[in-house]
């Protein structure tokens, strides 16, 4: 009898809470987000490599919490034209997603990654593709490093929309292009690994993806010298309230900046900030339904990233020259340099990667008596880059022989 009495009271209390209109809101313990895999399915990838990539993606999703109120996944192929293998709302379990990835056919064709990225942007925010509003968005791009079109502009558009970009490159690729494309910091979001060694990074990458989907509290990411991105768990809904973000430079209360955001927002990017400066950040949830405590955070922007300021051309020969630059930045601030050299009149472009801490390199195989444009680009750990250019001219290919002075022959007298 006591059991039925307690059960009846519990059911009555649950019904009363439902009728009262009190909104509990989503909890921060279960990650929510839309995860899009962008796989290079073009002819530049061998069938063996593609099969290894499919196994890798299957490993990633194996233990992730998928479901209508948790994570959702979609897969898009890179080829001559992008192709959706499955949408976000097509599968609701990790096993079903694994099975779909395992049988996904390679599409072949050209490697039009830029076109596929523009398509992925539409998919990530399209309700007809199963995407959800107000949840974190993550894109994982697995590539062999080659692309037939530009990836920079569409990648930047995705990041401007708050999408976190992870890149796994199984080939060399263009270091600067991939650094600029991945979210910051690069050491967390960009991986270079042989296709047979992909399982080595699966656990680390899976954890980073889930962290991006589920911030346990207000936190900062993509910290640069002039801005940073804030993320927080879904504390409100669009109908239950709104947020006020406050940004205060250290010791400058009069310079406070405020931004009001809807209740379904989970991220915001502050820009136009000062380098090497402490900022006090406050997230103030405003709701008439329930009381939520403010969250506070201190963030320090990075120091100004100074790229090459001077280029010196020396040791100029018909088919080679030496390029030096200053200042030489160490590995604490930069990942390295890319030196590019091409004829001003048009022609093939030479490029050399130089490790951090070095500030010179010799470029061989040039054309005699030709003017070149030399560009030195520093790639920073933040994912940004700075470049400086100068002109250089190789020496003539003809060697001028200076005649030796004639000496009097033996037995002859000088007049």
From Swiss-Prot:
Keyword Secreted: yes
Signal peptide: 1-18
GO annotations of cellular component type: basement membrane; collagen-containing extracellular matrix; extracellular matrix; extracellular region; interstitial matrix
Subcellular location: Secreted, Extracellular space, Extracellular matrix, Basement membrane
Domain Fibronectin type-III: 214-305, 307-405
Post-translation changes: N-glycosylated.
Keywords in alphabetical order: Basement membrane, Disulfide bond, Extracellular matrix, Glycoprotein, Phosphoprotein, Repeat, Secreted, Signal
Pfam family, any one: VWA
Superkingdom of the organism of origin: Eukaryota
Functional description taken from the UniProt entry: Promotes matrix assembly. Involved in the organization of skeletal muscles and in the formation of neuromuscular junctions.
Assembly behavior: Homodimer or homomultimer; disulfide-linked. Interacts with HSPG2.
Record protein name field: von Willebrand factor A domain-containing protein 1
Organism of provenance: Rattus norvegicus (Rat)
Taxonomic lineage of the native organism: Eukaryota, Metazoa, Chordata, Craniata, Vertebrata
């Amino acid at each position: 009898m006591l059991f039925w009495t307690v059960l009846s009271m519990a059911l009555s209390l649950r019904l009363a809470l439902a009728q009262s209109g009190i909104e509990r809101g989503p909890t921060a313990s279960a990650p929510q987000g839309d995860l899009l895999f962008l796989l290079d399915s073009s002819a530049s990838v061998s069938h063996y490599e593609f099969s290894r990539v499919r196994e890798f993606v299957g490993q990633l999703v194996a233990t992730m919490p998928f479901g209508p109120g948790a994570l959702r996944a979609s897969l898009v192929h890179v080829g001559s034209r992008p192709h959706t293998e499955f949408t976000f709302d097509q599968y609701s379990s990790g096993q079903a997603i694994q099975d779909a990835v395992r049988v996904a056919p390679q599409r072949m064709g050209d490697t039009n990654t830029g076109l596929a990225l523009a398509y992925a942007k539409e998919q990530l925010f399209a309700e007809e593709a199963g995407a959800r509003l107000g949840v974190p968005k993550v894109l994982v791009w697995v590539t062999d490093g080659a692309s037939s079109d530009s990836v920079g502009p569409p990648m930047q558009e995705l990041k401007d929309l708050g999408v976190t970009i992870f890149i796994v490159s199984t080939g060399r690729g263009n270091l600067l292009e991939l650094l600029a494309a991945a979210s910051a910091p690069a050491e967390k979001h960009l991986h270079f690994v042989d296709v047979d060694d992909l399982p080595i990074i699966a656990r680390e990458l899976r954890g980073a993806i889930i962290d991006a989907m589920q911030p346990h509290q207000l936190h900062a990411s993509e910290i640069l010298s002039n801005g940073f991105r804030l993320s927080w768990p879904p504390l409100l809904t669009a109908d239950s309230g709104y947020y006020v973000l406050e940004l205060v430079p250290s010791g400058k209360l009069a310079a406070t900046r405020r931004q009001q955001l809807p209740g379904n927002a989970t991220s915001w990017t502050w820009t136009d900030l000062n380098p090497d400066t402490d900022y006090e950040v406050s997230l103030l949830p405003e709701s008439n339904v329930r009381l939520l405590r403010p969250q506070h955070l201190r963030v320090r922007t990075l120091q100004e990233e100074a790229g090459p300021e001077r280029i010196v051309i020396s040791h100029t020969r018909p088919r080679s020259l030496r390029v030096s630059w200053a200042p030489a930045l160490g590995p604490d601030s930069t990942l390295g340099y890319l030196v590019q050299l091409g004829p001003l009149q048009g022609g093939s472009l030479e490029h050399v990667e130089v490790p951090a801490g070095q500030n010179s390199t010799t470029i061989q195989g040039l054309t005699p008596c030709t003017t070149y444009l030399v560009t030195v680009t520093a790639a920073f750990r933040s994912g940004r880059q700075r470049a400086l250019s100068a002109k250089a001219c190789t020496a003539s290919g003809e060697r001028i022989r200076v005649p030796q002075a004639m000496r009097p022959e033996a037995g002859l007298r000088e007049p």
